[in-house]
Amino acid sequence: MNIFDLYLDKIIILIKKLNKDGSLELPESLNGVNVDIPPSNFDCDISTNVAMVLSKANKKSPIDIANILIELIKNEDEKIESISAAKPGFINIKFKTIYWNNFIKSINQNHKDYGVNNKEKKQKYLIEFVSANPTGPLHVGHCRGAILGDVISNILIFNKHDVSKEYYVNDYGNQILNFTKSVFFRIREILFNEKFPIENSDLYPGDYLVGIAKNIIKSNKVLKFDKFENVSKELTLLSVSESLKLIKNNLSNLGIVHDRFTSETDIVLNNEVQKAIDKLKEKKLVYSGKIKAPKGEDDENWVEREQLLFKSTDFGDDKDRALQKSDKSWTYFASDVAYHDNKLNRNYDTLINILGADHAGYIKRITSVVEALSGDKKKLICKVSQLVKLIKDGKPFKMSKRKGDYITVEDLIAEVGKDATRFIMLNRSSDVELDFDFTKVKEKSKDNPLYYVQYCYARISSVFRHVNLNIENDLNIKDYEFAYTGDEIKILKKIAEWPKCIEAASLRLEPHRIPVYLYELSSEFHSYWNMGKEDQSKRFINEQKKISNDKLVFLKVISNVIKSGMDIVGVDTPQKM
């Protein structure tokens, strides 16, 4: 039950009725009409801008239109306690208690689907996220994007969309060659006591390579490690496979499971790069040309070479992009073109890419080529996961993958746990940098958002245990009378915002809205709980050690929303803390 959508429908029906009898003119579109959450300083439950939308078409001020509508709206609904106009033309509505009685009955009966946005057209989504090079375990920079992609998937699944989660394995090119060489030298170090060439800056010096090397030795799939050239092909496959095992384990410990891993090597060897480029050629979007020196590059040192270029400027990019170098080898971008063509061939309605902050500049070229191949400007949506700053002992902790002293996902989980990692990483918009403070995430206070929300659920669970009920079971209470006051209704109004939160999180792909909402709801509940220390009427367990049915239903509704939100975020709701 989305009270905002229900009331919007009522208002639209009313103004169309007024238009039909000649009392009111309508604009070309009513899409601008909304029913929303009023500011906290207004004593009302919902607010609508309908008068402002109708003002121009009727050549009257919004306040005049509002004054015409308020009596008509009130006459249409006996559950309205008060209705008023406020500048510049809002109509504010406050409901009688009976409205909230019906509201809580409705969502208690249909709690599993409460919040689902039935207005959204159901689609098939392919979400690609993480896609870190398979050259070692995941670090904190990957962690935020991984959680972002996973929770966006959960939100879309909650709204009944068909979602596939994919990891693109960049297992082709020089980085993989250098990674495999690093493993080779670690194997030589173990078998023949040869010193690892640490001075070679192209190699990966991390200690995790020792574990990968030992596993490859134990597999007995390569028997001789005399020269790298003799074993490079088989060793590359084994090294990438072992690295992916580490990555999949990292993701599993974060609560993330991908549906598919797509290999860049497979894309290249299946000649998909050439096929994708041929499609662009057919559209006359490829030509041979030269690229000028990039900004900041010395023109004197830049050598212009004839290359195969994609006309990405036709789609708003700042320059055309190279697909094939002068030596006829494909660029990294060409492989990406082929991969996205591969995605398009699988007939998804919408593609979503979660990119790290270092790939933000890559967005325009890849959205351009997807538009070129699909003819749909909105086919691909890219979300950027900004940097994470780790704070330890009051100081920033820096990481460097090349030096091998970076903080891994495993380090983070070992320090604060899976739940804290997921919740805190999601607690701010992905568009801004995040400070991850190790001290705060361990506190048992309102400064720790995860603890505050989990404690809300645990407190409610304690009341259910007191009356020998399992909070996870449905309540079979049919005969109950409501006696809610303004303090309870304040919480119910917050509960009423849940569908709006889900709608915004889904349409804008902004999952941080979920933990922010859960924290606000929990804060309202904790405040109410604390009132019971002074006010007997606010206590859930009365002097006779019993709880009224209306309070029990009230608690159940709160706990259902908390549980639903925490499931989307992917964290536990403990019944005891």
From Swiss-Prot:
Pfam families: Arg_tRNA_synt_N, DALR_1, tRNA-synt_1d
Single Gene Ontology BP annotation: arginyl-tRNA aminoacylation
PROSITE patterns reported for this sequence: AA_TRNA_LIGASE_I
Catalytic activity as recorded in UniProt: tRNA(Arg) + L-arginine + ATP = L-arginyl-tRNA(Arg) + AMP + diphosphate
Keyword vocabulary terms for this entry: Aminoacyl-tRNA synthetase, ATP-binding, Cytoplasm, Ligase, Nucleotide-binding, Protein biosynthesis
Gene Ontology MF terms in the entry: arginine-tRNA ligase activity; ATP binding
UniProt entry tagged with the keyword Cytoplasm: yes
A GO term from the CC aspect: cytoplasm
E.C. no: 6.1.1.19
Entry similarity comment: Belongs to the class-I aminoacyl-tRNA synthetase family.
Oligomer and partners: Monomer.
Protein name, UniProt field: Arginine--tRNA ligase
Organism field: Pelagibacter ubique (strain HTCC1062)
